[in-house]
């Protein structure tokens, strides 16, 4: 049987990189590209070592564990033991998740690809059956995206609704600070980009927008407000109109602004939620003034930039 070592190594390098990306996504870790490449290279080097006298070492469970430790440390670094074990166990979780999915899909479709000693190869002679290679190359990324979306759904369901949070939004050179309420009833998205929308009371935006522009937005229909705001309004290029439908109402439009950066501060962590829109409400959101914004629960699925200990 011919084995194209360079092709197998390249595939495993890509798969290791995807596993490390999934691990980082699960833990909300920010990983530098050079660390990701380094970790994936070390992981894929097992393929090369299997054809050397070191093969018994890398095939032994202790050898595989040692490689996993090195991969995790190179990719995520080492700060403390708790941090390290979180990374290691999550890496194994991602590996078992993807490996189980591949085995399940293999059993279902009866593909000719197999996993041997942690390395994915094909049973065909030569370069392999095009269908089996298509399964490997297409199936793994598809399973990766499927797993990522399911993890996002689980995170959204586990969010503690009705929790109060602090929100910092950067618009141009100015920063807005508001108190927000995480509300499961807020399921408003931009229908084109699927960007979640948080709602903020317009009074909080007046110091940033200016008095004249705030009056226009407050007293006119969103469609008319866009027409009346002239080029002197510095946030005109960031304004969006989002269609929505309230209970017992016909289709309406909500005027939104695209922030440059948004940070949400919960009791446990600070979350970067840059992919969002700020919907402008002309009515007060809380009668007793306990909060000034309604936070879309999907925004809490962003990357944690700091954990509160």
From Swiss-Prot:
Give the GO terms filed under biological process for this record: asexual sporulation; proteolysis; sporulation resulting in formation of a cellular spore
Q: What is the effect of changing residue 284 to D?
A: Reduced cleavage of SigE
Q: Where in the cell is it found?
A: Cell membrane
Q: Which GO terms describe its cellular component?
A: plasma membrane
Free-text disruption phenotype from the record:
Does not affect the localization of SigE.
Specify the protein's topology with respect to the membrane: Multi-pass membrane protein
Entry's InterPro entries?
A: SpoIIGA (IPR005081)
Mutating residue 245 to D: effect? Abolishes cleavage of SigE
Instruction: Give the Gene Ontology MF terms in alphabetical order.
Output: aspartic-type endopeptidase activity; peptidase activity
Q: Which UniProt keywords apply?
A: Aspartyl protease, Cell membrane, Hydrolase, Membrane, Protease, Sporulation, Transmembrane, Transmembrane helix
Q: Can you tell me where the transmembrane regions are?
A: 7-27, 36-55, 61-78, 88-105, 130-147
Q: Does the keyword Hydrolase apply?
A: yes
Q: Which domain of life is it from?
A: Bacteria
Main site of residence? membrane
Q: What is its EC number?
A: 3.4.23.-
- Protein's UniProt keywords contain DNA damage: no
Active-site residue numbers: 183
**Physiological role:** Probable aspartic protease that is responsible for the proteolytic cleavage of the RNA polymerase sigma E factor (SigE/spoIIGB) to yield the active peptide in the mother cell during sporulation. Responds to a signal from the forespore that is triggered by the extracellular signal protein SpoIIR.
Family per similarity comment: Belongs to the peptidase U4 family.
Assembly, per entry: Self-associates. Interacts with SigE. Interacts with SpoIIR.
Q: What's the protein called, per UniProt?
A: Sporulation sigma-E factor-processing peptidase
Species this chain originates from: Bacillus subtilis (strain 168)
